[in-house]
């Protein structure tokens, strides 16, 4: 039985509040300022290209994790209760993170990634359309094993992306989210690995 930690939800709510407050005063008209990651006030909302890329790439990465979680919750695939509980936990964690990153891109006057572009599938841990279709053909224990294996790779990809923005990014809000993603997903990987034992 997995227990969903309420702390990440409170943390995300706090970040959303900070983002909303920052968006009221932050002027994004000077894109040369944004590209250097500084603004006139040197405020919390300062960001650079690495922060933008992190949000643009992590949103579809999270969206695919939620798609995989929805598959596990589909009763026709007969996933185990352990898998279904973890899938629900993943959805609960990543849905608000998508909202947060989308709000950042809006505040920064930056676009979402074009999901029609083929390169989005090259992100670390992302499954191809064919791989997702193949997963959907499995049921029961076979589905559990394949799902856990896919989700471990997917989580490791997200952790790698978080590590990159921690090295290259500037926004302290992005840094905080990257730390949270690493913490959440490392914990979930440990659970997923036990499912493979």
Description of each model-found segment:
Residues 1-11:
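Bacterial N-terminal signal peptides that target proteins for export
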Residues 23-197:
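All-alpha RGS (Regulator of G-protein Signaling) helical domain and cognate RGS-like helical scaffolds
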């Amino acid at each position: 039985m997995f227990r969903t930690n309420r702390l990440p939800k409170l943390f995300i709510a706090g970040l959303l509040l900070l983002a909303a407050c920052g968006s009221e005063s932050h002027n994004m008209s000077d894109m040369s300022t944004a590209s250097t990651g500084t603004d006139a006030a040197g405020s919390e909302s300062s960001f650079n290209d690495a922060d933008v890329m992190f949000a643009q790439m992590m949103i579809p990465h999270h969206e695919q994790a939620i798609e995989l979680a929805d598959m596990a919750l589909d009763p026709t695939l007969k996933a185990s209760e352990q898998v279904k509980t973890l899938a629900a936990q993943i959805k609960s964690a990543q849905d608000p993170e998508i909202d947060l990153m989308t709000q950042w891109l809006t505040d920064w006057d930056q676009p979402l990634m074009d999901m029609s572009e083929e390169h989005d599938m090259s992100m670390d841990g992302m499954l191809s359309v064919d791989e997702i279709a193949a997963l959907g053909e499995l049921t029961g224990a076979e589905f559990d094993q394949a799902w856990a294996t896919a989700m471990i790779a997917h989580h490791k990809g997200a952790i790698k992306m978080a590590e990159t923005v921690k090295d290259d990014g500037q926004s302290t809000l992005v840094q905080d989210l990257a730390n949270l993603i690493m913490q959440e997903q490392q914990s979930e990987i440990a659970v997923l690995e036990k499912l493979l034992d």
